[in-house]
């Protein structure tokens, strides 16, 4: 399950917990720092990793509170590439991610990571939209 760094996504945690609870799955919650090349970053990797670590921990704790086994992982590197690599290395059954909360113009200008996951993944991707 992909957690967005610096974001609070309880609705995503609840959906993942429900899915895992029904199937008996274990959830690996991953969040990436988004730093591509540390040498060119204006922020030290340790600072960039903090929001990712907080997001993964918060979601994993919420999933565990629902009675589902969950482990959090903070990854280094671009989000989409890091999530896809983790999914391949750990033979994930499905990648669960949140739908974009950005407006249409922002998605067009900045991109949409859930769309990129769908396009690039060889595994099923479940996109959970935020409640209205």
Where are these regions (language model features)?
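Glycine-rich, Arg-bearing micro-motifs that act as flexible, cationic patches
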Residues: 97-119, 130
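Intrinsically disordered or low-complexity boundary/linker segments at protein termini
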Residues: 1-11, 120-132
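Small/aliphatic-rich secondary-structure junction motif
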Residues: 1-42, 46
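Structural beta-alpha unit
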Residues: 61-95, 115, 132
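General small-molecule cofactor/ligand-binding pocket signal
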Residues: 28-30, 71-75, 126
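Solvent-exposed polar/charged
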Residues: 18-21, 85-89, 119
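Short, surface-exposed alpha-helical segments at coil->helix boundaries
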Residues: 45-60
């Amino acid at each position: 399950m992909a957690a967005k760094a610096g974001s609070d996504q309880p609705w995503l945690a609840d959906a993942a917990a429900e899915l895992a609870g029904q199937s008996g799955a274990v959830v690996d919650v991953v969040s990436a720092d988004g730093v591509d090349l540390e040498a060119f970053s204006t922020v030290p990797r340790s600072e960039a990793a903090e929001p990712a670590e907080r997001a993964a921990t918060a979601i994993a704790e919420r999933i565990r509170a629902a009675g589902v086994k969950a482990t959090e992982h903070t990854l280094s590197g671009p989000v989409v590439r890091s999530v896809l690599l983790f999914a391949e290395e750990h033979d994930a059954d499905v990648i669960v991610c949140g739908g974009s909360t950005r407006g249409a113009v922002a998605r067009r200008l900045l991109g949409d990571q859930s769309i990129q996951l769908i396009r690039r993944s060889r595994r099923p991707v479940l996109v959970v939209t935020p409640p209205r």
